């Protein structure tokens, strides 16, 4: 899927043609630079590696510095691969948000907000154990039983329990493109996308 790297700016709302107030996410999409072109003959598959956001040379490792010099571009902070670009791209070419002109829907990949260690009520939507009366006083938000006793004498894998919540790679599909503002490299997408303000996202057609 062809696409771009972008940065989530935040959320706002716009009015639709019929006067409805539509919540939307503002994403700074690109400009991205081609840092590597992969071919079926050499790499086994065809893809384009894009770089987003400049960074200083002193903060770049020597292997990556050689990679960028080979492409003839300045060091980039974020890299990602995309497939199936319609136009043939060469090293150093720039891909802008105009890629999404005419696109009705996109998929957005991001990293969800980290919530730390959370219990089963917040993490999995459990309802808690029973009533708050009839002698119960210390198990309102507990998971309850996690298995039988002597058989199977173990807790099955995949049992939903408390633990680290968030910080996962999340893909949201078929989000409507409301507007492309090419002069400011902005993309307005209906609804919310994963991640906090300033987080890096992948936008795919």
From Swiss-Prot:
One of its GO terms (molecular function) is rRNA binding. One of its GO terms (biological process) is translation. It comes from the Bacteria. Keywords: Ribonucleoprotein, Ribosomal protein, RNA-binding, rRNA-binding. It holds the Pfam family Ribosomal_L3. SUPFAM superfamilies: Translation proteins. Signal peptide: none annotated. One of its GO terms (cellular component) is cytosolic large ribosomal subunit. Belongs to the universal ribosomal protein uL3 family. Part of the 50S ribosomal subunit. Forms a cluster with proteins L14 and L19. One of the primary rRNA binding proteins, it binds directly near the 3'-end of the 23S rRNA, where it nucleates assembly of the 50S subunit. This is Large ribosomal subunit protein uL3.
């Amino acid at each position: 899927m062809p696409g771009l790297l972008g940065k989530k700016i935040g959320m706002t709302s716009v009015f639709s043609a019929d006067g409805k107030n539509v919540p939307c996410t503002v994403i700074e999409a690109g400009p991205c630079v081609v840092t590597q072109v992969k071919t079926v003959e050499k790499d086994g598959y065809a893809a384009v590696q894009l770089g987003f956001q400049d960074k200083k040379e002193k903060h770049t490792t020597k292997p990556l510095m050689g990679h960028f010099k080979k492409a003839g571009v300045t060091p980039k902070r974020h890299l990602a691969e995309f497939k199936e670009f319609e136009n043939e791209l060469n090293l150093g070419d720039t891909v802008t948000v105009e890629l999404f002109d005419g696109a009705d829907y996109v998929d957005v990949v991001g990293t969800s907000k980290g919530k730390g260690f959370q219990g089963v009520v917040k993490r999995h939507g459990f309802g808690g154990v029973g009533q708050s009366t009839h002698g119960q006083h210390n198990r309102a938000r507990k998971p309850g039983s996690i298995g039988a006793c002597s058989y199977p004498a173990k807790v099955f894998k995949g049992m939903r329990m408390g633990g680290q919540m968030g910080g996962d790679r999340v893909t949201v599909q078929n989000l409507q493109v409301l507007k492309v503002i090419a002069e400011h490299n902005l993309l307005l997408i209906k609804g919310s996308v994963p991640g906090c303000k300033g987080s890096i996202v992948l936008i795919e057609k």
